[in-house]
A protein has these predicted regions:
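N-terminal "domain-start" segment
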Residues: 2-92
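Short, compact, well-ordered microdomains
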Residues: 82-121
Length: 121
């Protein structure tokens, strides 16, 4: 079992993207992939994604980016979020209440209004 009681999820099973979903999961994202749908259904990440996407929607620079890296880092008492442009330039960063992530660092990519796991690109 991963450190800190993290729930083990097999996210590596999602490669390529065979099916996309218009989100009906209560988050402000237009399209998600199978891997992200699985992640949302099997973890408590939904509320964190709502906060992250509120930040993106409030920032015109991030809205204009065609590619964003959303990095969630598990810390002892919180999650730390970094939103980058894909070239290690941090566009925003902030702490969130602790949730259990499937691993100590979870990266998600937001590409042309679609949220996906890096392995699904």
């Amino acid at each position: 079992m991963p450190k800190g009681g993290q729930k083990m999820l097999d996210l590596e099973q999602f490669t390529g993207s065979e099916q996309n979903f218009i989100t009906s999961l209560g988050i402000d994202i237009e399209v998600i992939t199978e891997g992200v749908k699985y992640l949302i259904e099997n973890t408590d990440i939904k509320q964190a994604l709502n906060v992250i996407f509120a930040s993106i929607q409030a920032n015109p620079t991030m809205q204009d980016e065609g590619f964003l890296v959303i990095r969630l880092i598990q810390e002892p008492k919180r999650i730390f979020v970094k939103i980058e442009d894909g070239n290690d330039n941090i566009l925003d960063s902030f702490p969130l209440d602790k949730i259990e992530l499937p691993k100590e660092q979870l990266d998600l990519w937001y590409v042309n209004n679609t949220l996906l796991l890096p392995s699904e690109y």
